[in-house]
């Protein structure tokens, strides 16, 4: 049986997403143009970027070799459970279970360009 189709995310609120970013991602990631990598890579321009391509960041083999393009739809699945989506990733984040919070964070990430 094919997997059940995923429900599309509700519309996201970038202002709420910024708060989520600051509370859950900023300890490991930056989102500023030209910003330094931290424990995780700089997320400026993440939406529609190929995984494993931020210069100067040492990615896990799983991430570097994944071939993933970070579309909003892919980010939705990844952010729900990073380790399930990409076994072997270095990202230790447990994930965001609430669809609205993922939608808000993705709306914020879409503005980082």
Swiss-Prot record:
Keyword terms, alphabetized: Electron transport, Heme, Iron, Metal-binding, Methylation, Mitochondrion, Respiratory chain, Transport
Location of this chain's protein in the cell: Mitochondrion intermembrane space
Location of N6,N6,N6-trimethyllysine modifications: 4, 83
Domain of life according to the entry: Eukaryota
Pfam families in the record: Cytochrom_C
Chain positions with N,N-dimethylproline modification: 2
Main localization category: mitochondrion
GO CC terms in record: mitochondrial intermembrane space
One annotated GO molecular function: electron transfer activity
Disulfide bonds: none
Residues engaged in binding heme c: 28-29, 91
PTM per Swiss-Prot/TrEMBL: Binds 1 heme c group covalently per subunit.
Protein family per UniProt: Belongs to the cytochrome c family.
Biological function: Electron carrier protein. The oxidized form of the cytochrome c heme group can accept an electron from the heme group of the cytochrome c1 subunit of cytochrome reductase. Cytochrome c then transfers this electron to the cytochrome oxidase complex, the final protein carrier in the mitochondrial electron-transport chain.
Protein name as catalogued: Cytochrome c
């Amino acid at each position: 049986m094919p997997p059940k189709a995923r429900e599309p995310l509700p519309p996201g609120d970038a202002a709420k997403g910024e708060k989520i970013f600051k509370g859950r991602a900023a300890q490991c990631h930056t989102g500023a143009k030209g910003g330094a990598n931290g424990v995780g890579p700089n997320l400026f321009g993440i939406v529609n970027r190929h995984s494993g391509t931020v210069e100067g960041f040492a990615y896990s083999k799983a991430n570097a070799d994944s071939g993933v393009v970070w579309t909003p739809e892919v980010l939705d699945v990844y952010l729900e459970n990073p380790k399930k989506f990409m076994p072997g990733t270095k990202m230790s984040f447990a994930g965001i279970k609430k669809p609205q919070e993922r939608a808000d964070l993705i709306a914020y990430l879409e503005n980082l360009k």
